[in-house]
């Protein structure tokens, strides 16, 4: 009988707290303080960063730098932090640009191969002169 009463009390307690927990939302990953004296030779190994704004349970503006196995919080007003953010943004753009140009190259190759498959008797426009209009291939003369 006592076990039944205890189970009912626990169920009522959990039921009463469930809407409050749900209303608060998901747990946010926040920086609660800055890592002081972050040196450039550490920040240059960061893989990515995220700017944290003041909202919800995060009450501190910060920049989170993601490394292989850890996260470091930096002050957005620090010069090294600003420099690392600039370089990581440029690195991200470069990777995006390279992947876009690689996909264009692959598209061109696939279109070229597609035209060869559609018409296997076609000859390539390029000749032995590599398309140069003034160059003519002549046989070598041998001196006997």
UniProtKB/Swiss-Prot annotation:
Keywords: Chemotaxis, Cytokine, Disulfide bond, Inflammatory response, Secreted, Signal. Residues 118-127 have a biased composition (Polar residues). Specifically expressed by thymic dendritic cells. High levels in thymus and small intestine. Residues 98-144 are annotated as: Disordered. One of its GO terms (cellular component) is extracellular space. It comes from Mus musculus (Mouse). Belongs to the intercrine beta (chemokine CC) family. One of its GO terms (molecular function) is chemokine receptor binding. Disulfide bonds join 30-58, 31-73. Residues 1-23 form the signal peptide. It is found in: Secreted. GO terms for biological process: chemotaxis; immune response; inflammatory response; leukocyte migration; lymphoid lineage cell migration. This is C-C motif chemokine 25. Potentially involved in T-cell development. Recombinant protein shows chemotactic activity on thymocytes, macrophages, THP-1 cells, and dendritics cells but is inactive on peripheral blood lymphocytes and neutrophils. Binds to CCR9. Binds to atypical chemokine receptor ACKR4 and mediates the recruitment of beta-arrestin (ARRB1/2) to ACKR4.
């Amino acid at each position: 009988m006592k076990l039944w009463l205890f189970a009912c009390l626990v169920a009522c307690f959990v039921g009463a707290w469930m809407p409050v927990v749900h209303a608060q939302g998901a747990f946010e990953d926040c920086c609660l303080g800055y890592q002081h004296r972050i040196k450039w030779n550490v920040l240059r190994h960061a893989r990515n960063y995220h700017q944290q704004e003041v909202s919800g349970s995060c009450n501190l503006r910060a920049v989170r730098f993601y490394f292989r196995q850890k996260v470091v919080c930096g002050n957005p007003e620090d010069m090294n932090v600003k420099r690392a953010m600039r370089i990581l943004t440029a690195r991200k753009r470069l990777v995006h640009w390279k992947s876009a140009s690689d996909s264009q190259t692959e598209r061109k190759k696939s279109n070229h191969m597609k035209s060869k498959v559609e018409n296997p008797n076609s000859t390539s426009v390029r000749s032995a002169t590599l398309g140069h209009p003034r160059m003519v291939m002549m046989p070598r003369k041998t001196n006997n």
